[in-house]
């Protein structure tokens, strides 16, 4: 069997691919593991509408009953938002979830893999996974980083998730040869905040110039992704002191409850949201 035998591309996305229209891949973990219902489905629909309003076609990616879905119907988004048995799927889980015909929401890594199969080059998400705090003891490093090193997809986000060790995450990306671009910024944003205290590799002020960089990189045969960081607007960001206090409190609670592995990121993000009252 070919990979296309496992792939279901939404007609709108298929038409856009055929016509060479701009397409933005979107992940689905936020729907099933990132937010409570109904905020999860409202956010998913709002993100898709934002893509459409900027004259591109959204392609939310997930796995439903063992099928790789590129572009979801409203009913499929509702299913992901309300079904407790939906798995969180990264690279290691992909083949098993498909083979056993289960349903799963895709992490950054899994979304990149499926986007590449569908020949979609740009993927937007809130923030990437990375090196967790305390990784020198736990070796807890997200598969997102390895995927960025190997898969030819540009990931646009608001930086690494603030719950991570951002300095070590940047070191890992440097080791793997992943360019970190700041869109109109010299500083790496930190998800909830426009500031992290760490510099990006390159500040680029034009989307067209970024597109030229992508085209050149892959034409040269230099495989791997590119991370484009676009800071959260200042009016929506959390003050660093509030953010760090909430994260530290969430980490303490995770340790008390012995939360580890793939459960740690959704737990911390949910706890930070709870502590900051959804800010």
Regions found by a protein language model. Give the residues of each.
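General beta-strand structural signal in soluble alpha/beta enzymes
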Residues: 24-26, 59-63, 104, 122-127, ...
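Ligand-binding beta-strand-loop-alpha-helix segment within the catalytic cores
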Residues: 63-64, 68-121
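N- or domain-start disorder-to-order transition segments that initiate the globular core
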Residues: 1-20
């Amino acid at each position: 069997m070919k990979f296309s035998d496992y792939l279901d591309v939404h007609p709108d996305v298929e038409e856009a691919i055929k016509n060479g229209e701009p397409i933005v891949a979107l992940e689905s973990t936020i729907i099933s593991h990132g937010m409570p219902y109904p905020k999860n489905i409202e956010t998913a629909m709002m993100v898709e509408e934002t893509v459409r309003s900027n004259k591109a076609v959204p392609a939310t990616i997930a796995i439903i009953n063992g099928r790789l879905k590129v572009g979801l119907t409203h009913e499929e988004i509702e299913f992901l938002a309300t079904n407790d048995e939906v798995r969180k799927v990264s690279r290691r889980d992909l083949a098993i979830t498909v083979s056993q015909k289960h349903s799963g929401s895709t992490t950054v890594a899994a979304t990149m893999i499926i986007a590449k199969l569908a020949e979609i080059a740009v993927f937007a998400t809130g923030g990437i996974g990375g090196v967790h705090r305390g990784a020198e003891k736990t070796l807890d490093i997200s598969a997102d980083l390895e995927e960025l090193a190997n898969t030819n997809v540009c990931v646009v986000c608001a930086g690494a998730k603030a719950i991570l060790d951002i300095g070590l995450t940047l070191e890992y990306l440097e080791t793997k040869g992943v360019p970190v671009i700041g869109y109109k910024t010299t500083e790496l944003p930190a998800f909830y905040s426009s500031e992290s205290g760490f510099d990006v590799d390159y500040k680029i002020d034009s989307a067209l110039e970024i597109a030229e960089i992508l085209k050149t990189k892959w034409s040269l045969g230099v495989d791997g992704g590119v991370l484009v960081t676009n800071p959260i607007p200042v009016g929506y960001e959390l003050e660093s002191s509030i953010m760090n206090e909430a994260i530290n409190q969430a980490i303490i609670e995770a340790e008390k409850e012995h939360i580890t592995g793939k459960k740690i990121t959704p737990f911390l993000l949910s706890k930070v949201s709870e502590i900051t009252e959804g800010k």
